[in-house]
């Protein structure tokens, strides 16, 4: 099982290194891989793609999608609205520590008359995305 997980996350080239010698992305992958060894029923992932390169991020996102298809529950926090839109069945939008909306991405977009979660978020807080950039 461990070898298949190492292969899944493309970690064979650093499997014998100390964790302190790994990059942020490599450390993230090791953390998620450690969870997989135990075959949990659910995952709680706090910004698992933060600080990762695009390839490592995609490996993590593909893993999450696959685990969801296998019936696993994933609680996923992120600041990346596009990720939430692509992998989450339901989202909770939070602003300044307060819940401002809960629903599927499509429900929230319909309610705010927008076409994506990022625009929906700004519509809900009464600001424009240009003001925040």
Go through each PLM region and give its residues.
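Hydrophobic anchor residue at the start of the ABC signature
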Residues: 32
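ABC ATPase "signature
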Residues: 102-103
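Conserved catalytic motifs of ABC-family nucleotide-binding domains
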Residues: 39
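Conserved ABC ATPase signature
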Residues: 18-22
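Conserved ABC ATPase "signature" region
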Residues: 1-14
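Catalytic Walker B motif of ABC-type/P-loop ATPase nucleotide-binding domains
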Residues: 43-46
